[in-house]
Amino acid sequence: MKNFYFLILILVFSPLHVFSEEVFLSLKKNKVNVRYGPSFDSPIKFVYKKINLPIKQIDKKENFRRIIDLKNNSGWIHVSQLKKINSLIPLEDKILFKKPSIFSKPLAKIKKGRVLLVKKCNENWCKVKTKKIEGWIDINNLWGKTPIIKKN
């Protein structure tokens, strides 16, 4: 009976979050087919036309990944169309700063929904890049993966 309670305690207090870590990927090309099922024989559901768009992987089967996007569209994409480059979409308008501080020089206003490539992140800020400009945004209200780099 003691073993049973011990097992229950282990299951309750074990770090289950390891199994539930979100996997974000980005679209590799400007045109990516999303299918109804995990096969090239499966019909095309819709087509993305945005390189680097961040999407969340929710399942996998062989060489296909089931994904969901910011607008809750879902389907299957072949791995050849995906990459692990980190990208983000702001869920609200953001100010791009020269340094990771609100007291730094503002460089630009980033509109909600714009795809940004992530260079690096710390606990509160991400250094991001567009086609024309690079700077820092705060990490609140973003869709995508923010790889936290902790200071030693």
Regions inferred by a protein language model and the residue ranges of each:
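Acidic, glycine-rich flexible loop segments
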Residues: 111-112
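N-terminal signal peptide c-region/cleavage motif recognized by signal peptidases
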Residues: 13-15
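Positively charged n-region of N-terminal signal peptides that target proteins for export
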Residues: 1-5
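Boundary regions of SH3-family modules and the immediately adjacent low-complexity/disordered segments
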Residues: 21-29, 38-50, 54-62, 68-105, ...
